[in-house]
């Protein structure tokens, strides 16, 4: 048997030993956290930017990156020196 075959066979034997009941759910929690992190990252990446308003969870575009308050409305502005 090749080295890869031995490693795969060993991993197959260890899988039943690491179940959520025996490890206190640590592996399950890690998998769930990883999925949530991926989902949040994809939500952030796919979120479209708004060049004018930054309320209701909208994100300002890079051209006007700063969210500022103008008479109660949150607008995207560019701060210059």
UniProtKB/Swiss-Prot annotation:
It holds the Pfam family Conotoxin. Residues 1-20 form the signal peptide. GO terms for cellular component: extracellular region. This is Conotoxin Im6.1. The keyword Transmembrane does not apply. GO terms for molecular function: ion channel inhibitor activity; toxin activity. The keyword Glycoprotein does not apply. Belongs to the conotoxin M superfamily. Its main location: secreted. Expressed by the venom duct.
